[in-house]
Amino acid sequence: MVKFESSGDPGFLSAVDGIANIAKATLDSQGRQPSHDGSDSEASAVVTFSGKQENLLSGLRRFDTVFLIDDSDSMAGRKWALVRAILQRATTIAARYDDDGIDIQFLNDENHNRSHITSSTLVMQTLASITPNGSTPLGAQLQKHLRAYLIYFDEQERKRPNSARQRNIIVLTDGVPDERQSMIKRTIVKAAKKLDKNDAVDEQLGIQFCVIGNEPGVAEFYSSLDNDLEQGEDLERDVSTHRI
């Protein structure tokens, strides 16, 4: 996770991790071979939580969840089936705890971006209509989304202080982005400094990277990004990455 926080709000972090760990649980589950129609056998698995976890996940009402999805050509096949399973689970959970649902955004096929989804059927229909193709412009898309969020944050603060909804961006990808690591680092640090300057609450924004598959060099890329973010930046909030 890229954590924009100082003290760490357990409720916020647990709610954030609850959604993100749906991805991890899907990837770790057994018997998840895709069927002949391209669906995933685990897509309809029931997700349950303890009473304590239920209370923590109620914190989802405090923020918007955005899945930024790598739809490059390398995501075709089994990886895309896993994306379907992850998002079906996530939609079910989000709808249970937050009437706003989730947003799904794509690196390449922006015509299929959807907002406030509470129906897993709509998620499946959207993903079924996409053929993964193209490169991995993660840096450019992350920059675009962070810039749009900061504009929204400023507008809300002018209307009423502390009224901007918190946001959690979960990136589903299988590889190293097209852009240099330094560009992604600058994008993240710039957003963190903007939040510092505007006295945003500690847990205003989070970014998590969920890596699907074991492509060479990917783990090293995000580990190095994490190390770079922890060093040499004069920030009032902690900034680090977490690779699921």
Model-derived segments and spans:
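Acidic, low-complexity intrinsically disordered regions
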Residues: 1-244
